[in-house]
């Protein structure tokens, strides 16, 4: 006792508050000083003291102790205000969705962090003895972030995919959560409800699989005698000291360790903490340790390779079941691992950037040539510098120099005045290799309906030439011009045509939609109705617009009397039919009318050699399905024109084959497509008669052989008509199948030989387990003639002006050789199409002509309406008068890369309205119809300019120009009208922007007044009528001459004074205006839109919605296409850093152990295994390459796997000793696959054998066995063990037992599980003794054979010669695995 007192007197007396960490330090010093027993005695006293004090002060925790932080209210308010401003920016198109998401997450993250920092000072000031504060601060219970959730705010959560939800949980648990917040936190939080429920079962199953793999591994021997080891070194900085200590303690050295000449530790010595400290002090390098990987045994492990037992700190005892311990050590913490870690979603790229702040107030100066403008990741404008930049701040009396490193963002402008502590630059944090980034796609969906436009040139994505995916080269806006879509499935019945104005009285077709029957080739079925203007009732012409999805109507255009004009389905047509028969002929014949279809591409541009018109000859039309064959005659299968159809993202080639043949064959067959659920009443390969019932509702039309095929949820049933022929032995025909036999050959051995009659098609059919027979099918032969001369159909004067355009006739077969053709819903199938191909003669003058543009022109004169086809030659480098720099012009880049400005894909129409029409159009306009394609390539009408999506700004100034004009017109009528209204006296076409050609009658009243007078006749006699082309040129199509008047400049400007800024705004037609731009004196303009009409006193603006897109974004959809709400508009690809992985935790461990390749695994190990293997084999050749390659590959992949699994556990704060993981990894990497390269006599190629067994066999037979390393998952490894009883008790019991019985496998009952199943004694612990067999002589044998080993000398040389090569391999392949490298001493020992 006195001794104790004396020692106590020498102790230092501490008088201070201790928290958890100080307590830890105290305990460790006590243990070092006094040992274990004494320390526990002291701690006991401390505990009693603590309880006494707690009882005295009576700490309790009630709900009133949870005090919220007073500053929370205004902090949250401030964050909400910032979010609101951000939302406004997003709405007006200044930032896009990704930038908005990033910024809002940073705003809320900062708010939440600030609240958390406020928490402690607040408690200290208001209530220092608050139990919550005492507990969390002293480390007794809870930490800062938990308390923060109780009294601060819960903050941001991640969704099930690990993405951040940008809706933060503002309440804390004291205030209670709203329903939305509760649901978000169920998913996002670390121990969320959803998370825990799933996790328990997953972890249990993982444990079971792990134990299954390693249950037979028991410590059986003291030493296996291996000389190999794995090197661990601290020197290269990749490994923290902490991990280094954890790795070494409890291991056994594989080699002596020297410090200079002095040996500080010997081989087979186990490492304690003292030795580790010496290693750290002396920086001994490298240290070779023994691990389960290096143990030479196959199905057990030795004491020295395992090391110390974690329970009592001595070497592990013999007979200990270390395998099961390892499996459980890894599986059990799985319940603590989350399925996803809770972190801030990795939204901050490369960590939060550092800020550079201004040292004092002053004016900032820098060299502007060194910076270029850019956007920060929040969408703010900034400058980025590529090299070091010196920034000077001039304050009153002193100059400050600030150096800004390269790649930083400068947030201020030159000569700007900055205040002290203002952020002037943002330094990008150096991206470390550990935080690897991942690319994330974010889709932006449109939230309104309308038409799509963009303001910049857009590149077509090269892999989708015909698709609708475009890439943006620079930052720009996408606009959706608002409109109300109207379903127009029966377009031709609707009275309205594109660009018509709807009056209040006008009516549209009631909605009668025909559902689009989806057919096998994804064609869209349209039904069109044509009105017959000659008193007959309507007839129906169903048509598949298959090739270009272009609508066709068989309408006749005689001169239509004015009264019927409105009935004509006025619509933009892309195909046009020139009648071939007069109406009298058509009434006499019952044949369906066939006309020439003129096919105009969607953009109205013909390339050379493209098809202008085609004629479907009724002789080549079939009603039934079948197969086309060209027979034995050669055909030139050049796909002259390949139509690539992209329909809902599916690419499909439709080649047309140019025929060089004079006949082809069609083999008819009957085909029924039935839904998968229907019951079929006939068997496959059976023979039926005519009108047999084959399904509940279907009867056969012909008799013959039935073939049934089941494809993707539907059943195809084909009936082949023809004769069945059972061949004899000597029959030649029987050897052929699928051949055409010309007439006159006849059939041998057949009585009914049809000589010289027809061609026949022979098909050989082998039903199951029956004798095969031959089916002889009839063939329809088609001769191909030249068809109609199409060129004559065009009036000669049409081609006079273009003598260098020639048309030639080509026949195309629409279906390839042997392609099955299906009839769909009783439509006829056209087999041959006669096409008129446009061919420009390339003479010197017109050598630059590459394409012609065509459009249909509908001209109305005095109430009559006729249609013409107009062909214009276009010179190839398209040069229009449009100014390239004009921001309001829209450009479009076509596939050939030339920049076509303002090509309107819809042909314009211009009408000269007679009196009655113009009067009618004076009624209140309700809107304008605009017909476009939507994404499914169907026609669709939009109502634009209705009161809902169009508004008028103005008046700008108070002068009424109307009166002035009226007076001047009365004096001298024709001239002012010409000056004001354009040559036609009606309207200026306001469509300089691209798919609009809008007719707006402007000052209509004046027109009417003076059209009634006769003095305008002269004007209109000179100008017969005008056509207005898409580009805005006005053509004077006088019949005698072909003069082009000066192009009408539509891009006219309107100058008016803007009183907001005192400067004038120039407004042009078609210009897009964002929100809050000043265009009038009465304040800023409130909505965004596009200028449609500019009048003297007002503008009409069509509502539009901007979406910002940055470079590299992908735009979906074509220009001018109709979008519905919810369609994908843009896809952004942005980088975000991830801390480790987002799918962390259990799923990640399982992926690694099951060796599944998932994107989130940074390196797909299986591929790397093959890669290393090939690389080494190439270097060293066979067989050395194989042996060394397999060996190295296995070592490398083992180290990589261990590191991966450890990384996941460490990231979650779970400590597992490496050797547990090593035991499991050893089992899943211990098999090799015998390869075919060096054929050995022992194993079959493709056989899975143990690595050690392969090596021993190679030594015994003194020949090289070639094999490669494979990675098995834990499930596979448990099904590939030496014991079939253990396998059968795990999975697939019947299969395993059956296979074992067939192979005659023997189970030696070495593992635990087999013995448990059979009720024997398990070979561990006390039951271990019976199994130990004295195998000393075995060891001696192996030592003697050393000298005879054929590999020894050469192997050593090769290994040491290539040592550097291997080392470099390692350092390249692993970023974090060089903590353990590989020592290649003596492969002969293995």
Swiss-Prot record:
Catalytically driven reaction(s): RNA(n) + a ribonucleoside 5'-triphosphate = RNA(n+1) + diphosphate
Subcellular localization: Plastid, Chloroplast
InterPro entries (alphabetical): DNA-dir_RpoC2_beta_pp, RNA_pol_beta''_euk, RNA_pol_Rpb1_3_sf, RNA_pol_Rpb1_4, RNA_pol_Rpb1_5, Rpb1_funnel_sf
UniProt GO BP: DNA-templated transcription
SUPFAM superfamilies noted in UniProt: beta and beta-prime subunits of DNA dependent RNA-polymerase
KW Cytoplasm (keyword) present: no
Broadest EC class assigned to this enzyme: transferase
MF terms (GO), sorted A to Z: DNA binding; DNA-directed RNA polymerase activity; zinc ion binding
Residues the record lists as binding Zn(2+): 224, 295, 302, 305
Keywords of this entry: Chloroplast, DNA-directed RNA polymerase, Metal-binding, Nucleotidyltransferase, Plastid, Transcription, Transferase, Zinc
Domain of life: Eukaryota
Gene Ontology cellular component annotations, sorted alphabetically: chloroplast; DNA-directed RNA polymerase complex; mitochondrion
Entry-linked Gene3D superfamilies: 1.10.132.30, 1.10.150.390, 1.10.1790.20, RNA polymerase Rpb1, domain 3
Cofactor: Zn(2+)
Entry's EC annotation: 2.7.7.6
Cofactor comment: Binds 1 Zn(2+) ion per subunit.
Protein family membership: Belongs to the RNA polymerase beta' chain family. RpoC2 subfamily.
UniProt xrefs under HAMAP family: RNApol_bact_RpoC2
Subunit-level organization: In plastids the minimal PEP RNA polymerase catalytic core is composed of four subunits: alpha, beta, beta', and beta''. When a (nuclear-encoded) sigma factor is associated with the core the holoenzyme is formed, which can initiate transcription.
Entry function: DNA-dependent RNA polymerase catalyzes the transcription of DNA into RNA using the four ribonucleoside triphosphates as substrates.
The protein, known as: DNA-directed RNA polymerase subunit beta''
Upper classification of the organism: Eukaryota, Viridiplantae, Streptophyta, Embryophyta, Tracheophyta
Gene: rpoC2
């Amino acid at each position: 006792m006195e001794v104790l007192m004396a020692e106590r007197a020498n102790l230092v007396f501490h008088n201070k508050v201790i928290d958890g960490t100080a307590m830890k330090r105290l305990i460790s010093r006590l243990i070092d000083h006094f040992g274990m027993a004494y320390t526990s005695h002291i701690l006991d006293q401390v505990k009693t003291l603590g309880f006494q004090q707690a009882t005295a002060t009576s700490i309790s925790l009630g709900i009133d102790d949870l005090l919220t932080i007073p500053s929370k209210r205004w902090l949250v308010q401030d964050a909400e205000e910032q979010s609101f401003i951000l939302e406004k920016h997003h709405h007006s198109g200044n930032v896009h969705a990704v930038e908005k998401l990033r910024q809002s997450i940073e705003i809320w993250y900062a708010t939440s962090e600030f609240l958390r920092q406020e928490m402690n000072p607040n408690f200290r000031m208001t209530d220092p003895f608050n139990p919550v504060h005492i507990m969390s601060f002293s480390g007794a219970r809870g930490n800062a972030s938990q308390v923060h959730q109780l009294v601060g705010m819960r903050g941001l959560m991640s969704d099930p995919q690990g993405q951040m939800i940008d809706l933060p949980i503002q309440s804390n648990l004291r205030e209670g959560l709203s329903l939305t917040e509760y649901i978000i936190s169920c998913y996002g939080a670390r121990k969320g409800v959803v998370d825990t429920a799933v996790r328990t079962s997953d972890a249990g199953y993982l444990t079971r699989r792990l134990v299954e793999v390693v249950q037979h591994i028991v410590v059986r021997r003291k030493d296996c005698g291996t000389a190999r080891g794995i090197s661990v070194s601290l020197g290269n900085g990749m490994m923290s000291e902490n991990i280094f200590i954890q790795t070494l303690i409890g291991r056994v050295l594989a080699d002596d360790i020297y410090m200079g000449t002095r040996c500080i530790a010997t081989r087979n010595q186990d490492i304690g903490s003292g030795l580790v400290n010496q290693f750290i002090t002396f920086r001994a390098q490298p240290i070779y340790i023994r691990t389960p990987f290096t143990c030479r045994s196959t199905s057990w492990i030795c004491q020295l390779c395992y090391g110390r037992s974690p329970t009592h700190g001595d070497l592990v005892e013999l007979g200990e079941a270390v395998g099961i311990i390892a499996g459980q050590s890894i599986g059990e913490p799985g319940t603590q691992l989350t399925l996803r870690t809770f972190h801030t979603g990795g939204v901050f790229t490369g960590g939060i950037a550092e800020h550079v702040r201004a040292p004092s107030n002053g004016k900032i100066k820098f060299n502007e040539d060194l910076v270029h403008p850019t956007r920060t990741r929040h969408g703010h404008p900034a400058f980025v510098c590529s090299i070091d930049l010196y920034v000077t701040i001039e304050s009153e009396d002193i100059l400050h120099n600030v150096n800004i490193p390269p790649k930083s963002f400068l947030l201020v402008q030159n000569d700007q005045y900055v205040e002290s502590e203002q952020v002037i630059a943002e330094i990008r944090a150096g991206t470390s290799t550990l935080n690897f980034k991942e690319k994330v796609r974010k889709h932006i969906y449109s939230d309104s309906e309308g038409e799509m436009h963009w303001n910049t040139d857009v590149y077509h994505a090269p892999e989708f030439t015909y698709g609708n995916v475009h890439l943006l080269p620079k930052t720009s806006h996408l606009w959706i011009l608002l409109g109300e879509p109207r379903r127009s499935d029966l377009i031709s019945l609707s009275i309205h045509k594109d660009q018509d104005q709807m009056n209040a009285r006008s009516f549209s077709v009631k909605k009668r939609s025909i559902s689009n029957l989806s057919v096998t080739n994804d064609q869209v079925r349209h039904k069109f109705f044509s009105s017959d203007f000659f008193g007959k009732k309507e007839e129906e012409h169903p048509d598949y617009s298959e090739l270009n999805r272009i609508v066709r109507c068989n309408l006749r255009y005689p001169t239509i009397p004015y009264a019927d004009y409105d009935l004509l389905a006025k619509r933009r047509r892309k195909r046009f039919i020139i009648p071939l028969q007069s109406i009298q002929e058509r009434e006499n014949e019952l044949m369906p009318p066939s006309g020439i279809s003129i096919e105009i591409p969607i953009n109205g541009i013909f390339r050379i050699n493209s098809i202008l018109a085609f004629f479907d000859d009724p002789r080549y039309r079939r009603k039934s399905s079948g197969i086309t064959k060209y027979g034995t005659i050669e055909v030139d299968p050049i796909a002259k024109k390949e139509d690539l159809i992209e329909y809902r993202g599916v690419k499909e080639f439709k080649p047309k084959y140019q025929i060089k043949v004079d006949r082809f064959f069609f083999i008819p067959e009957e085909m029924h497509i039935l839904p998968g659920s229907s019951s079929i009443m006939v068997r496959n390969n059976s023979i039926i008669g005519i009108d047999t019932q084959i399904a509940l509702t279907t009867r056969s039309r012909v008799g013959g052989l039935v073939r049934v095929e089941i494809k993707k949820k539907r059943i195809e049933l084909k009936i082949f008509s023809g004769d069945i022929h059972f061949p004899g032995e000597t029959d030649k025909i029987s050897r052929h199948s699928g051949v055409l036999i010309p007439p006159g050959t006849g059939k041998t051995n057949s009585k009914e030989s049809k000589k010289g009659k027809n061609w026949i098609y022979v098909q050989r059919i082998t039903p199951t387990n029956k004798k095969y027979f031959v089916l002889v099918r009839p063939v329809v032969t088609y001769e191909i003639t030249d068809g109609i001369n199409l060129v004559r159909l065009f009036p000669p004067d049409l081609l006079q002006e273009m003598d260098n355009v020639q048309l030639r006739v080509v026949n195309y077969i629409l279906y390839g050789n042997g392609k099955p053709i299906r009839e769909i819903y009783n439509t006829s199938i056209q087999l041959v199409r006669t096409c008129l191909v446009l061919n420009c003669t390339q003479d010197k003058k017109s050598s630059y002509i590459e394409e012609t543009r065509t459009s249909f022109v509908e001209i109305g004169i005095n109430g009559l309406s006729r249609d013409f086809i107009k062909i214009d030659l276009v010179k190839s480098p398209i040069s229009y008068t449009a100014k390239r720099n004009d921001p309001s012009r829209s450009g479009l880049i076509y596939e050939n890369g030339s920049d076509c400005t303002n090509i309107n894909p819809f042909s314009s129409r211009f009408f000269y309205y007679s009196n009655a029409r113009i009067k009618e159009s004076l009624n209140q306009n309700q809107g304008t119809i605009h017909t476009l394609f939507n994404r499914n390539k169907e026609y669709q009408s939009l109502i634009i300019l209705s009161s809902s999506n169009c508004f008028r700004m103005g008046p700008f100034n108070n002068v009424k120009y109307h009166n002035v004009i009226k007076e001047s017109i009365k004096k001298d009528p024709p001239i002012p009208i010409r000056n004001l209204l354009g040559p036609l006296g009606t309207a200026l076409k306001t469509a300089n922007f691209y798919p609009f050609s809008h007719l707006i009658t402007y000052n209509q009243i004046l027109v009417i007044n003076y059209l009634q007078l006769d003095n305008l006749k002269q004007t209109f006699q000179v100008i017969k009528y005008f056509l207005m082309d898409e580009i805005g040129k006005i053509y004077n199509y006088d019949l005698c001459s072909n003069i082009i008047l000066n192009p009408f400049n539509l891009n006219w400007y309107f100058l008016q004074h803007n009183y907001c800024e005192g400067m004038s705004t120039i407004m042009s037609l078609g210009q897009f205006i964002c929100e809050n731009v000043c265009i009038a004196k009465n304040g800023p303009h409130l909505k965004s839109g596009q200028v449609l009409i500019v009048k003297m006193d007002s503008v009409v603006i069509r509502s539009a919605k901007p979406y910002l897109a940055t470079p590299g974004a992908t735009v979906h959809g074509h220009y001018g296409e109709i979008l519905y709400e919810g369609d994908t508009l843009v896809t952004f690809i942005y980088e975000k850093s991830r801390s480790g992985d987002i799918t962390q935790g259990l799923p990640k461990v399982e992926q690694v152990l099951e060796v599944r390749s998932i994107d989130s695994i940074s390196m797909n190990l299986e591929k790397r295994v093959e890669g290393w293997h090939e690389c080494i084999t190439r270097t060293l050749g066979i067989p050395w390459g194989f042996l060394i390659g397999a060996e190295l590959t296995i070592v490398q992949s083992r180290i990589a796997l261990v590191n991966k699994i450890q990384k996941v556990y460490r990231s979650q704060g779970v400590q597992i000793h490496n050797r547990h993981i090593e035991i499991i990894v050893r089992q899943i990497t211990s098999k090799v696959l015998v390869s075919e390269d060096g054929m050995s006599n022992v194993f079959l190629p493709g056989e899975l054998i143990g690595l050690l067994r392969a090596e021993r066999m190679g030594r015994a037979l003194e020949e090289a066995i070639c094999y490669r390393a494979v990675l098995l998952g834990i499930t596979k490894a448990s099904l590939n063990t030496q014991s079939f009883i253990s396998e059968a008790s795990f999975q697939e019991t019947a299969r395993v037992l059956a296979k074992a019985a067939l192979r005659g496998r023997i189970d030696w009952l070495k593992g635990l599980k087999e013995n448990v199943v059979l009720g024997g004694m398990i070979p561990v612990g006390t039951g271990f003794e019976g199994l130990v067999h004295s195998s000393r002589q075995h060891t001696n044998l192996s030592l003697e054979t050393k000298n005879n080993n054929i590999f020894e000398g050469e192997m050593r040389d090769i290994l040491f010669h290539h040592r550097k090569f291997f080392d470099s391999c390692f350092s390249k392949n692993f970023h974090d695995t060089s903590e353990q490298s590989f020592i290649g001493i003596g492969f002969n020992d293995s």
